[in-house]
From Swiss-Prot:
Keyword Coiled coil belongs to the record: yes
InterPro entries, per database record: Schlafen, Schlafen_AlbA_2_dom, Schlafen_AlbA_2_dom_sf
GO terms for MF: ATP binding
Signal peptide start and end residues: none
Keywords: ATP-binding, Coiled coil, Nucleotide-binding
Entry similarity comment: Belongs to the Schlafen family. Subgroup I subfamily.
Record-listed ATP binding positions: G258, V259, E260, D261, S262, G263, L264, V265
Listed Gene3D superfamilies: Schlafen, AAA domain
Superkingdom of the organism of origin: Eukaryota
Designated name of the protein: Schlafen-like protein 1
One Pfam entry name: SLFN_AlbA_2
Sequence segments annotated as region (Disordered): 1-31, 139-170
Length: 404
């Protein structure tokens, strides 16, 4: 390169250098700002999670409880009112409203697989021969229904069109109004919503008890159990069979666990997981009763107990209420899933009844029904005689002319 050309190049490059020097270069974002930007970009957002291949043999409340426990083990806690379960005769699925990061949602399938391998998830939650299907719900979800149909399940309506789904809010969970959360729980059966649910640091439910309060004495329709130690895992299932069967064969009643025989409220340690297990246990036992016991025949609630002592596990009173059986056209006697029959007496349970005792019970019930029918026939007979007398009094007078 010649000296002249080199000087020209120097003269041309200097103005650029001066101009860049005069204007300050834009500052690069600092590490703190990048961190804030990434946090803002990865902020939790609301998503609708589709859960397929659920076991249709369980009822909707039990599926909701088991699914909530499963999501907790996957480090994705969800309130029960944010779980919408759709159950068909041979298929079931759920739509869950979650507020998580995108990366958490993307890692959900492999975390589910890891939990299944470590036996942290109840296998019975999935349909027989199937595995749980977790994915983000987008659009009408028709392709997921086709996957279930291809996998052997019976076809059903499209969940996006045939079932009216709730309009999930698009903003995050902390900004949701409390009225919406209460409304989503009020529209469901009473067995689904727990009295111990907490929304905005307030107990949702009209019932709460104070430790040491006096509830009264046991009656024919009220039974108290202290429930200490390993009661929930050992004795609770036997008491469910005995007392529910006895209440069904009488005028109904309530079993309260966490109350002493004297009527003082103590409460039992009952976590959300224990609550779910209790619901599953009661549901599985009552499904084996004969005649069939429908969900509207009983109510299982968990009443929070307010205590002055600080405990990590909340105290609750388990209340299993059997409603007064509807009048039947003929006497009906319930038996447990083990074929045993119990009756409620004043302050005690009679049973299991022998064959002769059951026959005597049926004979007495039929005598009562026969007496009612005889009384009804007597009333109808009297009404018939009165109507005949009225017809004779108001009837036309006939005259007969005799010619001699």
């Amino acid at each position: 390169m010649t000296p002249m050309k080199r000087s020209v190049q120097t003269q041309v490059s200097e103005p650029f250098t001066e101009s860049w020097g005069e204007e300050s270069l834009p500052e690069l974002p600092t590490e703190q700002s990048l961190t804030e930007y990434s946090d803002l970009k990865e902020a939790p957002s609301a998503h609708t999670l589709y859960v397929g291949h659920l076991n249709p043999q369980f009822s909707v409340p039990v599926l909701a409880c088991l699914l909530r426990d499963t999501l907790e083990r996957l480090e994705m806690p969800v309130a029960r009112e944010h779980i919408e379960v759709v159950r068909r005769p041979r298929k079931a699925y759920a739509l869950v409203q979650v507020t998580v990061r995108r990366d958490t949602l993307a890692s959900l399938p492999w975390r589910l697989q890891t939990a299944l391998e470590e036996h942290l998830i109840l296998k019975e939650l999935a349909a027989r021969g199937k595995e749980l299907l977790l994915s983000e719900a987008q659009g009408p979800l028709s392709h997921r229904e086709e996957e279930e149909e291809d996998s052997g399940l019976s076809p059903g309506p499209n969940p996006g069109s045939g079932v009216p789904l709730p309009a999930w809010p698009t903003h995050t969970l902390p900004d949701r109004p409390q009225a919406w959360q209460l409304q989503s729980c009020q529209g469901r059966p009473s067995g689904v919503c727990s009295d111990s649910a907490i929304v905005h640091h307030e107990i949702v439910g009209k019932d709460q008890l104070f430790q040491g309060a006096f509830l009264g004495s046991e009656t024919r329709n009220m039974e108290f159990k202290r429930g200490s130690g390993e009661y929930l895992s050992l004795a609770f299932k036997h008491h469910v069979r005995r007392y529910v069967c006895a209440f069904l064969n009488s005028e109904g009643g309530s079993l309260l666990v966490g109350v002493e025989d004297s009527g003082l409220v103590r409460g039992i340690r009952c976590s959300h997981r224990d609550e779910d297990r209790a619901r599953l246990l009661v549901d599985s036992i009552l499904q084996g009763f004969k005649p069939q016991v429908f969900p509207d025949a009983y109510t299982l609630t968990f009443v929070p107990v307010i205590s002055t002592s600080e405990t990590n596990v909340p105290l609750k009173v388990i209340r299993l209420t059997v409603h007064t059986p509807k009048a039947q056209s003929q006497p009906q006697l319930y038996q447990t899933d083990q074929g045993e029959v119990f009756l409620r007496r004043d302050g005690s349970i009679q049973g299991p009844l022998s064959a002769s005792a059951i026959q005597e019970w049926c004979r007495q019930r039929w005598l009562v029904e026969l007496g009612k029918l005889e009384e009804r026939v007597k009333v109808l007979t009297m009404e018939k005689e009165q109507l005949q007398q009225q017809l004779q009094q108001h009837g036309p007078m006939s005259c007969t002319c005799c010619v001699l």
